[in-house]
């Protein structure tokens, strides 16, 4: 992604700090993986041209907001962040709290295994699904989530 370059100077600085402590970045990453798990990420981008395409994107977002499932592909939904309303709903504790980030047309669904986020592009006739999960058969699960949202 075009924004990924921003992390490079920070990673260089962090690697230098670790080296001063006698560690390598590889060691640190292995510790993180051991403690947190290995997450995989995938981006699905769908283009819908013209007025009908814009309406389809809006309908997908509206439907996803109003009919958020309690589980997806066997993964239990534990929380939902709707950046348009500025609210986070914790389904485990049945609590609603405010999101401190700016309002945006983004929905983020959390599972114990990670999250997915859905948002329309601000500059193109596209809608994007971000999948970040730590689970077996990641590619299959990610594709099934994509299909469930866009082929319904």
Residue map of PLM features:
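Phosphate-binding and adjacent anionic-ligand microenvironments
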Residues: 1-119, 126-130, 137-142, 149-152
């Amino acid at each position: 992604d075009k924004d990924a370059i921003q992390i490079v100077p920070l990673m260089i600085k962090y690697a230098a700090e670790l080296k001063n402590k006698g560690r390598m970045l590889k060691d640190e990453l292995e510790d993180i993986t051991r403690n947190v798990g290995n997450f995989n990420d995938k981006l699905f981008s769908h283009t819908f041209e013209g007025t009908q395409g814009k309406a389809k994107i809006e309908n997908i977002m509206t439907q996803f907001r109003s009919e958020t499932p309690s589980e997806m592909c066997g993964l239990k939904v534990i929380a939902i962040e709707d950046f348009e309303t500025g609210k986070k709903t914790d389904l485990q504790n049945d609590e609603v709290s405010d999101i401190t980030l700016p309002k945006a047309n983004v929905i983020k669904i959390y599972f114990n295994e990670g999250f997915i986020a859905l948002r329309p592009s601000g500059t193109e006739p596209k809608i994007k699904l971000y999948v970040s999960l730590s689970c077996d058969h990641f590619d299959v699960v990610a594709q099934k989530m994509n299909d469930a949202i866009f082929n319904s």
